């Protein structure tokens, strides 16, 4: 059967989310019969495969594909070569998608052949109804917390540097190739940069909406931000054009603390400079926490104050580590 849209969903131990994700794909306004849905799995040791195969027995166009490389960029490439559909939509198992998500993505590509990737707004949901899960969801709406990415805070259609869970015409894959398989994270940053360099545009449409489940604990949030930061460090050797100012601010913050602390041990004036910088940061932290808590509830004031610092430091420290561990990527294409 000839499908019009290849839907690629990378997974690894997603038994808690994959059924809801597949249900949101099945319920799309875009004709489900025209979709080739591929769950490309990196070796899950939970019930992910069992759940997907149950869906596959009910729907002939849902299939499970093994990903020996485990990481998401490899999953994307496997999905692309296993389908002939002219449009490719890369979804995330951790997310749900509004009923018209795929329909509007495909319409965006069909309306302008210069668009190489189209996506939309990502609403952050708490993993569960705990204090830290809700705090993390609130933090993701703060410019101070995460930065100013259009897909988090944008309200107007625009051409941007990147979008999550994007849709691509197959011609993009044929022209620029697949995602880099040596990047476990930030592969989308590098891929979107390559798309733009090839003459295509990346389009953000706020009417295209997905909902993503944030990490449930402070530790899990810090681990995720550390990994995200490490991937930015790797991009120094791969494609510096895909790194924006918002990616660099946590690095500058952490380097400032480290250098300031070292200099303070030898030169007294740097003690005051370090303290002044930290006071300024924590003042901004408190103001951002206060404003968010005023809107969402005062019980979030202290958790937000703590989480802002922890995720910023984790991201910045991860970037430093990534800068040193990413040297092996320097000469790879």
Regions flagged by a language model, labelled:
Residues 1-27:
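N-proximal low-complexity "stem/linker" segments adjacent to membrane-targeting elements
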Residues 41-50, 69, 92-96:
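A conserved acidic beta->alpha catalytic loop
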Residues 67-83, 104, 160-163:
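Glycine-rich, basic loop-to-helix element that forms the pyrophosphate-binding segment
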Residues 100-134, 138, 209, 213:
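Conserved donor NDP-sugar-binding/catalytic core segment of glycosyltransferases
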Residues 180-243:
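Catalytic donor/gating beta->alpha subdomain of glycosyltransferases that bind UDP-sugars
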